[in-house]
């Protein structure tokens, strides 16, 4: 993810300039970002996350401590994915990511407490909106299809990704959640299931899309509203053919 790339640039700069700065103190940021962005935990990602989790468990930043209070035991990938990550992402989805930046670099405990309370309120609001969208989206699920592709008017764009993840929990298939972002344009988030490269399937549909980007397990896209049915059927056909007409299993 972008945070991991930034970290590699910092370490390369240190090597080039022979700097004595200990860059390992930033690995907690890398772990949080890599896991929250659902990046594959392979190769260097896996190594950086391993060491980043060690930093979080041994010397957590002041801004993280309130989040950690509600978690029992050692912080691992799962606890970041399901507890800390959603709170971090909620700020950007519901208001602005700057709140999280300010929180993570804050060294005053009182200011950090105030910021973490703000984040918690945003997360609670996100959960209410998410539940409403999930309830609407579930009514569009077709159990006979190999994909979940749903679209709703007025859905908050900030929760589309997590709604897609929630739908996968109920119906284990590659999932796309879309809403109308502006006049006649649909914007959406894509989430995949284990071992299925959803980005490749999007690439095979690119002629019907205005824009798309992401990686194997998560992506975003835009398309004309008039192309929705064409895209929905094309994506379904590609996924169905690629898995040999066998339904996904956990």
Kindly give the residue locations of the regions a language model identified.
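Active-site cavity-forming subdomains of large catalytic enzyme subunits
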Residues: 1-16, 42
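Hydrophobic helix-and-loop "lid/oligomerization" segment in the mid-to-C-terminal part
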Residues: 14-236, 244-247
